[in-house]
Design a protein with these regions (language model features):
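Metal-dependent amide/peptide-bond hydrolase catalytic core
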Residues: 1-5, 12, 41, 194-199, ...
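Short, solvent-exposed loop/turn segments at the edges of secondary structure
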Residues: 73, 111, 153, 185, ...
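Structural motif
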Residues: 89-92, 122, 157, 187-189, ...
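Acidic/His- and Gly-rich active-site-bordering loop/insert found
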Residues: 2-124, 147-152
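Glycine/charged-rich beta-loop-alpha catalytic/anionic-binding loops adjacent to active sites
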Residues: 113-125, 217-218, 360, 392
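Short, conserved micro-motifs enriched in small and acidic residues
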Residues: 121-136, 149, 227-233, 401-408
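Short beta-strand segments
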Residues: 94-96, 159-161, 190-193, 217, ...
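Acidic/histidine-rich catalytic neighborhood of metal-dependent amide-processing enzymes
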Residues: 129-205
Length: 420
């Protein structure tokens, strides 16, 4: 069948796509790690939307999490069989249900985070671009095929999973650990959770990720009598600055496959400051987000951080009320060692390149990013995966939006992938 017929069908579903996206944005799906209830309500809404669609199979896998609503983090798989059912490689399209917290509400000037509005060809709201746009695009790519009675060349598996934003412990990582039978080495995987405004960037590699929290314990005292205690704030500031300089100097290699081409080490959070200007705090925390080129070993970075803790601790060492201070502890909040990149000549890369060239008339660019997508989990299993979408890159920002044209046009590419 002429692919243009499918594209016209997708265009005819534009308003349905917008309505679906608006409905999903209205439901907060913030992780319990970030103070939310999780994804239960959003998963229920999604199941309600697709219950009468002619999927061949819909499966739900609930990861136990007592902190979440009803004690579970839902993961949904919807299958639309291809012409050869299980005989040919299957195409996975993975999106996530969860969203990041709204942040500073005063900076949301177009609308409130979970009260979506449609304006100037965009849908505003938290989770609109990350990852609602691609979630809805994947749904309606398949819906168009269903409406036309078309079976794709290969089976499509739409995966809607939890916990992407805070580590995937209750999402894809849990699925792979508890249900390895779901995955096959010959699967083709598209993760539409990264890209550029032109829709030409195909990500095949990611940096390693290390989130580490440095906890400094001193002794709180009145700021006018600092000698009676130990100011944890001062110790933490020196430690953070010294570590920042050390990591940038020691791990300074560049790899032009990635953007940016160097490793990044960013102090992102601080905690436990004093609650009055005349208190020298007894505790302080600093968090580093490290995105490290695959050529480096994360153990070396952790060892450097630990060694520096010893040096800084020795510099400020003193006994207060019988206790030797400071105590500097390093906690690994998240760690993901970068797997080998998806080969440039793998089938999913070639198919996506062909679709972009043929149906967008643009030359695709292959590269790597700072990490943090589902693709890394598949690559660790030896399953080729790519990250691609057309994005204005408003994710995690106030006034986040999804451009409707991007959503519709990406649905066309997703449908084409299933047919090529």
């Amino acid at each position: 069948m002429d692919v243009e017929v499918i594209f016209k069908e997708i265009e005819s579903l534009r308003e349905n796509m917008v309505d679906t996206l608006v409905g999903l944005i209205r439901i907060p799906a913030v992780s319990p790690d970030s103070g939310g209830e999780g994804e239960y309500d959003k998963a229920q809404k999604l199941l309600e939307i697709i219950k009468d669609w002619p999927f061949d199979k819909i499966e739900r896998y609930d990861a136990p999490d007592p902190r979440a609503k009803n004690g579970v983090r839902p993961n949904i798989l919807a299958y639309y069989y291809g012409e050869q059912r299980e005989k040919s490689p299957r195409l996975w399209i993975l999106t996530h249900l969860d969203v990041v917290p709204p942040g500073d509400l005063s900076k949301w000037t177009v609308t409130k985070p979970f009260e979506p509005v449609v304006k100037d060809g965009k849908v505003y709201g938290r989770g609109s671009e990350d990852n609602g746009q691609s979630l809805v695009a994947s749904l309606y790519a398949v819906r168009a095929l269903m409406n036309l009675g078309i079976r794709p060349k290969r089976t499509i598996i739409l995966a809607f999973v939890s916990d992407e934003e805070t580590g995937s412990k209750y999402g894809l990582e849990w699925l792979m650990k508890e249900h390895p039978e779901l995955f096959r080495k010959d699967d083709l995987v598209l993760v539409p959770d990264g890209g550029n405004e032109e829709g030409t960037f195909i990500e095949i590699a990611e940096k390693s990720i290390l989130w580490m929290k440095i906890k400094v314990k001193g002794k709180q005292v009145h700021a006018s009598m600092p000698g009676l205690g130990l100011n944890a704030h001062r110790v933490a500031l020196e430690y953070a600055k010294t570590l920042d300089d050390l990591l940038h100097e020691k791990y300074s290699a560049r790899d032009e496959l990635f953007d940016p081409p160097e490793s990044t080490f960013e102090p992102t959070m601080g905690g436990n400051p004093s609650d009055a200007p005349n208190i020298a705090p007894g505790e302080h925390e600093v968090v580093f987000d490290c995105r490290v080129l695959p050529q480096y070993n994360l153990d070396d970075i952790l060892n450097d951080a630990q060694e520096l803790a010893g040096k800084i601790g020795e510099k400020y060492k003193k006994e207060v009320n019988g206790e030797v201070l400071p105590k500097i502890e390093i906690e690994v909040m998240q760690r993901l060692d970068a797997p080998a990149p998806t080969p440039r000549d793998s089938e999913i890369v070639k198919l996506l390149q062909k679709a972009i060239k043929e149906f967008r008339g643009k030359e695709p660019k292959i590269g790597g990013i700072g990490g943090g997508t589902f693709a890394a989990y598949f690559r660790k299993l030896g399953i080729p995966a790519v990250v691609w979408a057309t994005l204005d890159e408003t994710a995690h920002q106030p006034n986040e939006y999804a451009k409707i044209d991007n959503m519709v046009e990406d649905a066309k590419i997703m449908a084409a992938l299933a047919l090529l």
